[in-house]
Amino acid sequence: MDVLLIGSGGREHAIAWKLKQSKQLGKLYIAPGNAGTAQCGENVEIKDSDTPALVDFAKQKRVGLVIVGPEEPRAKGVVDAMEAAQIKAFGPNAGAAQLEAD
Protein backbone atom coordinates (compact mmCIF):
# COMPACT_ATOMS: atom_id res chain seq x y z
CA MET A 1 0.00 0.00 0.00
CA ASP A 2 1.27 3.45 -0.89
CA VAL A 3 1.10 6.02 1.91
CA LEU A 4 1.18 9.82 2.06
CA LEU A 5 2.50 11.16 5.37
CA ILE A 6 1.83 14.85 5.95
CA GLY A 7 4.27 16.88 8.06
CA SER A 8 7.89 17.84 8.50
CA GLY A 9 8.75 17.36 12.16
CA GLY A 10 10.33 14.76 14.37
CA ARG A 11 6.98 13.01 14.85
CA GLU A 12 6.71 12.47 11.10
CA HIS A 13 10.30 11.23 10.90
CA ALA A 14 9.54 8.63 13.59
CA ILE A 15 6.35 7.56 11.79
CA ALA A 16 8.17 7.35 8.44
CA TRP A 17 10.98 5.30 9.98
CA LYS A 18 8.50 2.81 11.42
CA LEU A 19 6.37 2.64 8.26
CA LYS A 20 9.48 1.89 6.20
CA GLN A 21 9.93 -1.30 8.24
CA SER A 22 6.57 -2.70 7.12
CA LYS A 23 6.56 -5.33 4.39
CA GLN A 24 3.09 -4.06 3.43
CA LEU A 25 4.38 -0.59 2.53
CA GLY A 26 4.67 0.18 -1.16
CA LYS A 27 5.75 3.74 -1.80
CA LEU A 28 6.04 6.30 1.01
CA TYR A 29 5.53 9.97 0.19
CA ILE A 30 6.13 12.68 2.81
CA ALA A 31 4.83 16.21 2.31
CA PRO A 32 6.81 18.32 2.82
CA GLY A 33 9.15 16.11 4.85
CA ASN A 34 12.64 16.85 6.14
CA ALA A 35 16.19 15.52 5.80
CA GLY A 36 15.40 12.56 8.04
CA THR A 37 12.21 11.56 6.23
CA ALA A 38 14.08 11.69 2.91
CA GLN A 39 15.95 8.58 4.09
CA CYS A 40 12.66 6.73 4.55
CA GLY A 41 10.66 7.75 1.52
CA GLU A 42 10.17 10.44 -1.10
CA ASN A 43 9.77 14.02 0.12
CA VAL A 44 7.19 15.96 -1.87
CA GLU A 45 7.33 19.75 -2.16
CA ILE A 46 3.78 20.46 -1.02
CA LYS A 47 3.15 22.54 2.10
CA ASP A 48 1.19 20.75 4.81
CA SER A 49 -1.22 23.71 4.75
CA ASP A 50 -2.08 23.30 1.03
CA THR A 51 -5.07 21.00 1.38
CA PRO A 52 -6.23 21.07 -2.28
CA ALA A 53 -2.72 20.20 -3.53
CA LEU A 54 -2.42 17.37 -0.98
CA VAL A 55 -5.77 15.90 -2.04
CA ASP A 56 -4.83 16.18 -5.72
CA PHE A 57 -1.47 14.49 -5.06
CA ALA A 58 -3.10 11.65 -3.11
CA LYS A 59 -5.57 11.10 -5.97
CA GLN A 60 -2.87 11.26 -8.64
CA LYS A 61 -0.64 8.75 -6.85
CA ARG A 62 -3.60 6.62 -5.74
CA VAL A 63 -2.34 6.35 -2.19
CA GLY A 64 -4.14 3.87 0.02
CA LEU A 65 -3.73 5.85 3.23
CA VAL A 66 -2.95 9.41 4.29
CA ILE A 67 -1.50 10.03 7.76
CA VAL A 68 -1.72 13.60 9.05
CA GLY A 69 0.85 14.40 11.74
CA PRO A 70 0.80 18.13 12.59
CA GLU A 71 -2.04 19.74 14.54
CA GLU A 72 -2.54 22.71 12.20
CA PRO A 73 -3.46 20.76 9.03
CA ARG A 74 -5.72 18.50 11.07
CA ALA A 75 -7.51 21.52 12.58
CA LYS A 76 -7.88 23.04 9.10
CA GLY A 77 -9.67 19.95 7.82
CA VAL A 78 -7.14 17.91 5.83
CA VAL A 79 -8.63 14.64 7.11
CA ASP A 80 -12.15 15.84 6.24
CA ALA A 81 -11.01 16.80 2.71
CA MET A 82 -9.34 13.42 2.17
CA GLU A 83 -12.41 11.54 3.33
CA ALA A 84 -14.66 13.70 1.11
CA ALA A 85 -12.44 12.64 -1.81
CA GLN A 86 -12.89 8.96 -0.84
CA ILE A 87 -9.27 8.69 0.40
CA LYS A 88 -8.65 6.86 3.67
CA ALA A 89 -7.05 9.17 6.22
CA PHE A 90 -5.70 8.62 9.73
CA GLY A 91 -6.19 11.50 12.13
CA PRO A 92 -8.99 13.44 13.79
CA ASN A 93 -11.45 15.48 11.78
CA ALA A 94 -11.34 19.28 11.99
CA GLY A 95 -13.82 19.52 14.85
CA ALA A 96 -11.97 17.04 17.04
CA ALA A 97 -8.57 18.52 16.14
CA GLN A 98 -9.70 21.96 17.37
CA LEU A 99 -9.42 20.67 20.93
CA GLU A 100 -5.67 20.28 20.50
CA ALA A 101 -5.10 23.28 18.21
CA ASP A 102 -6.79 25.89 20.43
Language model segments and positions:
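ATP-binding N-terminal substructure of ATP-dependent carboxylate-amine bond-forming enzymes
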Residues: M1-G95, L99-E100
